[in-house]
C-alpha cells in the first residue's frame, strides 16, 4: 500500500531553513545594537532628591502640549492705548485705568467738568457725591485738565478699559516697557512735580521639573531643582508732594523715541485749548497746574506683588477684580495688583468699609449698557450685585451673527488686518450711542452733548490753516453761506428770543458769569495786548476792514432802524442809561489805568464829536 505524506520532504526542509535564517538574523541585529551612554557623575540625579516611577515596557509617556493663552488684544494695540498715560504717577494711572472701564461714566464726568470749570480738588469730588458714578470716576473730576484730555477721545477711553479688563498683566507690562523707553530717551526723570524711582525686583526662585533619560530598567527619575529668574527693573512714579498732583502731558512720538510698530501709532492727547499746561519743548513733556487734594488718590499699584494668595478676605464680594478666579488657595489675580486705601475710598463714596487690605474689582453695574469687547468678557462681567454675593444671569445663545463676528475677530488677530465694519457693527455702534444718550442723566440730549464738546487742538489748528489759506472770495462765500444757513438762522432767532424774554436779573447774571470766566478774561487780556502793541498803521487797516465787512454794515443798518423806529420815551431811557454808565466807565480804575495820555485825549475828542453831531441833529 502506497502512503501519501501531506508535506513533501523538500518543503519541510525549506521551511526549517527559513526559520533558522530568520532567527540568526534577529540575533545578529540584537548583537549590533548600541547601548545608551552613561551620564557623567556630575549630571546624575541623586536618588534622595528624585521620585521613581516605573512604567510598563510597552507604554510611553504622552507628549505634553503647552496651554494656548487666548489674547483679545495684541501687544502693539495695548502699547498704542497705554502710551498717553504710561508716564502718569502710579496712583493716578491706576484710577485712570479703573475709570476707563466705565466709558459712559467718564463721558458724563467730562461734561460735568466742562460745565463747572471752576470746580477742582476735593470741592469737585464733594459736588459729584450724588452722581451715579463709580468711585474712580468721581475721583478724577478733581483734575479738570485730566477730564479735558479724556474728553478728547472717548473711543480711546473705551479701548483702554477693554484692554485692562481683558489683559491687566499685559497692560502693566506695557507701562513698564514704555517707561523704560522714556527713561532711555531722557524724557522721564525726577522733577519738582514728581519722583521717578527705579528699583530692581528681587529674583524669584522657581521650581522646575526635570525628567531624566530612560534607563534600561524602564524607570523615570524626576527632580525639582531651583532655578532663579533674572532680576527685572521696576520704574514707579510718585508725586513729589503727596497733597499736590500735576497732570503730565506729552507727545508719545517724542518721549518714547522711534515707535517700533508704525501700523499702531501711539494715541496722542494734545493739551486742550484754554487749559494751562506748562510745556517743555526740549523734552516734549509738560505738566498742568498743580491741584491740591487730600483724598482724591485712593489707590496704588503693587509692582512687587508676586504672591497672589494673600488677597483673600472675608468680604471679597465687592472689592476684588473680576478677572481673577477662586480656588482652594484663595483669590487669584491676573496681575493688576491695584490696592485700595480704604480711608480715602470711604470719603469719596460715603461708605464705611473697615477692611484695610482691599483690591479693586470691576463692577458691571456702572457699565450702563455699554457692551463689552467680546463674548468671553461679557460672560465674565455680565453679573448683578445681590445680597449675599454675585449672581450670574443667563446670556442668550450665540447666533450666526455673533459667530461670524468672532471668526472675523480671530482672523484679524492672526493677520493684523484692519477690522471689517459690517452692518451689525454699525448697528451695535448706533445702539451704544443711543444707550449712552439715555444714561446721560441731566445731559439727556446726546446731540447737544456732542456739540458742546470742546474742539481738540488738532481740529482748531486745521481750521485756522484752512481759514488763513483761503482767498477773500472764499471767506466771503463762507460768510454768506453761514448767514443764509437756516439752522444757524434758527439758532440766532432762538438766542435772540431767549435774550428778549430774559429778566434784567438773568441778563446781569449772564454778564457777571462771562466777566468772571477765566477763559474769557484770558481772551480779553490777549486782545488788549495785541491792540496796545499794534502800530497806528495796523489799527487803521483793521478799522477799514471792519467798516468794509458787510455783516458790520448790516448791524449798523439794523441799529439805525431800531433807533429811528424807537419812540421818544425809549430814546430817553436809552440816553439816561448811557449817561449813568459813562461816568462809571470813565472813573473805573480798570479802564483809566490802562489808557495813556494820547488814548485819553482821543477818547475825549470822539466824545466831543458825538456830542456835536447830536446837537446838529
UniProtKB/Swiss-Prot annotation:
Pfam family, one: DUF3300
Extent of the signal sequence: none
Region of interest (Disordered), residue spans: 387-419, 443-599
Bias (Basic and acidic residues): 490-499, 522-531, 572-585
Compositionally biased tracts (Polar residues): 387-396, 453-474, 549-570, 586-599
Top-level division of the source organism's lineage: Bacteria
Sequence ranges of Low complexity compositional bias: 404-414
Listed name of the protein: Uncharacterized protein YacH
Species in which this protein is naturally found: Escherichia coli (strain K12)
Lineage, top ranks: Bacteria, Pseudomonadati, Pseudomonadota, Gammaproteobacteria, Enterobacterales
Gene this protein is translated from: yacH
